[in-house]
Amino acid sequence: MTEKFDYKELGLKVGLEIHRQLDTKKLFSPVPSELTEKVDFTFERRLRPTMSELGEIDPAALEEFKKGRKYIYEGNYELSDLVYMDEEPPRGPDREALEVTLQIAYLLNAKPVDEVHFMRKIVIDGSNVSGFQRTAIIALDGKVDTPWGSVGIPTICLEEDACRIVERKEKEVIYRLDRLGIPLVEISTTPDIHHPEQAKVVAKYIGDALRATRKVKRGLGTIRQDLNVSIKGGARVEIKGVQELDMIPLIIEREVERQLNLLKIRDELRERGVRPEDIKEEFYDVTDVFENTESKIIARTIKKGGNVLAVKLPKFRGLIGREIQPGRRLGTEMADRAKKYVKGIFHIDELPNYGITEKEVNAVIEKLGLGELDAFVLVAADEETAKKALREVIKRAREAIEGVPEETRRALPDGNTQYMRPLPGKARMYPETDIPSIFIPPEEKERIKANLPELPQERVERYVKEYRIDKSLAETLVNDERDELFEELVKKGVKPSLAASILVVVLKGLKKEVPIENITDDHIREAFQLYTEGKIAKEAFEEIFKELALHPEKSAAQVAEEKGLTLLSEEEVERIIDEVVQQNIEVIKAKGMGAMGMIMGRAMAKLRGRADGKLVSTLVRRKIQELS
């Protein structure tokens, strides 16, 4: 397969940051680390940034503060105590969380520190009530070997997760406290990844090490993968929230494409002779041009007493509409910046459109005194809001002349990315004074190192050898994190081949029909218990799981009863087979054992899920032989 880019020539550098929730108690309070929809109380806060010890303010924190938002927190008495309301000093940290992180460190060839010191990382988007996140380095200097070469893991950290967002409004954000404080392991690599597929290999290896502990949470939102991507002449861009492993190569490829196109735009702007200082912060009121406009957005704004303001972007015509990622343009980047104040912008390269006529476009060009290569951007809002939005556009336009801006971006489902905020600075960390340093005795390190869990690939090989199941089944069990449940079922007497087949083949087969994520491990345990007690046939699993996926509040026993899936006695099975045989007696007399397939099919149509297939086959064979 031909690659889209020569990544070596482009000097691609990628670093990973992987965050995974640990399945222990909360990090600084002995409350369960679970999520809930039950809300017992609410309170509100406003947050502001503080200077670091060097008198600096983190730019990302400052930008968040400028939004002037109020934060409302929803809490539950069982899952949120005074520690996470920031009304009481932290306790802990949780020893199990610390031990699991040390296991992960050894699995990734890292060296644990002798003493753990927690720090405070400034976060004032409201996701931490205190305005900071507690984090500590647990190990240093790990590595992952890949076919492309080794990738370093400079740090493995243990930190607390943030609140869960419920609703975001213009001047108010509602958070739920339940997720705040769940232990989170953060693993950072060096930027020694030079190919998109290499990034996927490294992420998978780290994910395997995490899952090997069997103490990480599963499900949506429990793992977050961030990428740091740069190319020669470009800039370091942090891409947050990559959910799927398979999306990593595409997201990197799209970021390379974006940076290359931004560099081409930079070169063209320089050829046109434009400099950042040529873009003036001058706002033109062009409301009169749109007095009788057909644009619904603009007409609605003017009717409310708003304005239409414009800025002039010298020598930008034809470049704002230039595609930089599939379906995204430089104008999209400008709009992303402006969206903290307005819903969108209009620019010359996309007009006439959206109800704006050519006559109106020409009137704006004339009013601004634009030359042939000059562009404009419009915003419809109240005057102050419009100016704030256009200042963001001006800032992004100036950055376009410089090349690729350093920033934090959000991963989108299609592989593209979207602006989130400036890249965080270093002025956001300071010591945590409420938690004493924690000494890790050498004997504790040795104990953990001597009892490391097996890695997923080792587990796959063991399953094939010990349980004699197909390798692809074993790999799917491990990759889908059903391996622990599989071993539990086998210990209870379920045949390994049946347990693996139900957990992999049956559940995967239902994925396109029903939401199988609603089927819990307890549902599965109960269904297998019914089977081992002889109450259901193995053919009943599919029907039971299908119903449980749609109605997870039900039990497996309840579904089996409602759907008539409980096993019939041997006498009842024989009676139904006798009926089928009598209905087809002439065919049996004519074909003898040649009628076996037909009779078996008709019998199973009546008995599927209510009788064991082997028993039905034995009885049908006997009945046919008696008549032949």
Curated annotation (Swiss-Prot):
- Chemical reaction(s) catalysed: L-glutamyl-tRNA(Gln) + L-glutamine + ATP + H2O = L-glutaminyl-tRNA(Gln) + L-glutamate + ADP + phosphate + H(+)
Q: Does the keyword Nucleotide-binding apply?
A: yes
Transmembrane stretches, start-end = none
- Gene3D superfamilies on file: 1.10.10.410, GAD-like domain, GatB domain, N-terminal subdomain
SMART domains attached here? GatB_Yqey (SM00845)
User: What task does this protein carry out?
Assistant: Allows the formation of correctly charged Gln-tRNA(Gln) through the transamidation of misacylated Glu-tRNA(Gln) in organisms which lack glutaminyl-tRNA synthetase. The reaction takes place in the presence of glutamine and ATP through an activated gamma-phospho-Glu-tRNA(Gln). The GatDE system is specific for glutamate and does not act on aspartate.
Query: Which SUPFAM superfamilies does this one have?
Result: GAD domain-like, GatB/YqeY motif, Glutamine synthetase/guanido kinase
Can you name this protein? Glutamyl-tRNA(Gln) amidotransferase subunit E
Instruction: Name the InterPro entries for this protein.
Output: Asn/Gln-tRNA_amidoTrfase_suB/E, Asn/Gln-tRNA_Trfase_suB/E_cat, Asn/Gln_amidotransferase, Asn/Gln_tRNA_amidoTrase-B-like, GAD-like_sf, GAD_dom, GatB_C_1, GatB_Yqey_C_2
One Pfam family per UniProt: GAD
Keyword annotations from UniProtKB, A to Z? ATP-binding, Ligase, Nucleotide-binding, Protein biosynthesis
Q: What is the lineage of its organism?
A: Archaea, Methanobacteriati, Methanobacteriota, Thermococci, Thermococcales
Q: Quaternary structure per UniProt?
A: Heterodimer of GatD and GatE.
Which GO annotations describe the biological process of this protein?
A: glutaminyl-tRNAGln biosynthesis via transamidation; translation
| Enzyme class at the top of the EC tree | ligase
Q: Where is the signal peptide?
A: none
Its family remark reads:
Belongs to the GatB/GatE family. GatE subfamily.
Q: Write down the EC number.
A: 6.3.5.-
State a single Gene Ontology molecular function: aminoacyl-tRNA ligase activity
Q: Which GO terms describe its cellular component?
A: cytoplasm
Family matches, as NCBIfam families: gatE_arch (TIGR00134), PRK04028.1 (NF003107)
Question: NAD among the record's keywords?
Answer: no
Q: Which PROSITE patterns match?
A: GATB
